């Protein structure tokens, strides 16, 4: 900034005349302050014409000079506009507010301001007010022209090598397209060179990662029994820079192309997994008919997460995500702890997610004095990374088997030839770039730095970037970041393969930054290859694709060896899979697994199992019950580790629900207390109940609200005889009673969200608190529900939009039957209405065919209900019927696989819709003494 503003300006303003080309560019941008660019473009044009003439003469190239200059000037204009647009809008508004713009209307006043931008004196006034803006523009222009000069010189020197390597006739250069991507190391950018027949990619950094990757692809193509060989992009590594084959986008022409594309994607994923590659987002991938083209492998190896040890479970979870196939960003990367809340992955394109975290700015009201920048949310991009067939995007979700087949074949090849792979890597001269923070974060800082208050002096700009100093142990790194950002560059860090040092902006060496070198990290990774690891990565692939919302077709989950007559053997298969997927903190006191979830705002993500009984929390109860039944301490211990983690991160501000809120935590802690006899779990349960506040602002139904919690509290009271539980139930019950009495809308039928759930809670509370009004009102609700019973269907009508007749735990006859048997137990006397409903509900279970295997709305839920009715009502024939149903269902699973409750999941360990609920029912079939979680019973 020591340069004098006027001295810099003199360079650009020495000639006010401009060419037809510059005038045309400025006129095309007239609605967005086009005249502001004129002196800068004129200067660039003169320099470029001289450089191109010198290049042509020295290296005997012919070229389309006008086209090339026009393209480069367009790139320069884009960068100048990005730097200056906010300042120019502010300046326009200053003059507008002071009535210093001529014109009768908004357009005329804007045109008057744009005309002022052609006045050298006015430009000097602007830049004297904002000298940092001039410095940034001057730096950008100098760097851009230096890039072009350097590129041309290297092209001339490498002419013959390029011709031989890529089979390109480079004699005629027709265009130079500088990418709009990030700039590094004094404005260096990837650039596309167009020749008369083909194009070529110039990269202002070495291509050692691409060279190594290509060598490994060649090796595995020789060794693997691939259905289809892997393809690669040719490259010429020149040390400090390189040339790469230009990939051309092409749609799939057949179903075979689609299979090849995703098969090769899966195989490439296995190679990237070796390196823990972390930057395969949508901008780095192009769909090329039957193969993905990966054209930016600068960050081939990610060693940052792997070299940082963490004792906390969350640290292990983050590390697992980063170091697994999920961390490559090739798969849909919807991680709950990630900085992005929409999909930017290499496979993105089918998701329509809108971000609530990330925004961009676009110009509005251009060409008027109302011109401004509006803030718009980012959305999942739809770019040429997505494969197209018959004018539609081909979803990766519908091609899971292709991806897994390719991954399996390549993984096994790498595993069987690990020594040779390591030898190839060891001999390479790999230099890796490291992205220490999300590039989008740097972009935010750079965008903010174009606000006028950061353009008045360099100290204000430094003050903005100093906000990066949140960790004093990283001061060397942050100094490098600030150094680059001050030049409006994205910081650039790199390291050699065998070094633990890191190099900042290619100039500052920071020793011992990593605890392991890149080679050590790669060696550790490939040495952990095994059947267990392979299965885990396949699970992660399925979970990642499950975050895409399309339903799964022609897919069923195979449980493994399935013994029809051995309930516990099947349950053990599920438990052992969970054990293999579990992640532990360093003390082995806490654990979790990664699962796909749907958040309350209906977004899909991958994250650690939650504390909700409905989804992750139920896994704890399944493991604890199985461990007790088998006398297998490892399952009980894992349940404790899962619970300890949940208790360390539990959110006590959640809803009161027994399935998805505080009630889940109460139930799980109490259940674990009964299994382990550890008082700390009971104390936590008691504390949670004591903190329950009766509030009107909560839902009321059995699953998501207070009705289920009331039943749970009363069940615990029956065991513990502690007044706290019934007092809380009475408080919640009175509010439920009053709320339902004032309810104007028709209530749904069924247990989970309807009349049965309300009636059960009120009648049970009425009997235990001796309040007849609750019993009477509960019976009134049952009569109301029975008005929707259809004798011809042997079932109650579902009052949602489709008016179907279902028989599940959540909706329809099965859940209603469970409600009636529990009410029958509570009132301890015969009631014709309740008895008839119970028999009708049992009939509906026997005649209804389920489409799912789950316990919420599937066959195992109905099996559990038959078992509970048989046990509670002393009806042994129903217990036998439940076992008959189970035998048929297990036989079906052995042939056709498991159908999850949500058909958009490939693999699901959740309790109510997935495997662990099925597993828990199998335990109850083996030993009826375990409580039914569907009725919130306790041990």
PLM features: residue spans?
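Hydrophobic residue at the +6 position relative to the catalytic HRD Asp in the kinase catalytic loop
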Residues: 283-285
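C-terminal catalytic region of ATP-dependent kinase domains
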Residues: 1-99, 117-149, 156, 291-572
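Conserved ATP-binding subdomain of kinase catalytic cores across diverse folds
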Residues: 52-136, 142-277, 291-293
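Low-complexity, Ser/Thr/Pro/Gly-enriched N-terminal "stalk/linker" regions
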Residues: 545-615, 622-625, 629, 730
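CBM-like carbohydrate-recognition segments
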Residues: 855-856, 873-939
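Well-ordered alpha-helical segments within folded domains of soluble proteins
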Residues: 242, 264, 610-625, 657-671, ...
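Long, well-ordered core segments of solenoidal/helical folds
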Residues: 571-589, 634-653, 680-699, 728-745, ...
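Structural helix-adjacent loops and short alpha-helical linkers that scaffold large soluble proteins
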Residues: 560-571, 626-640, 672-686, 716-731, ...
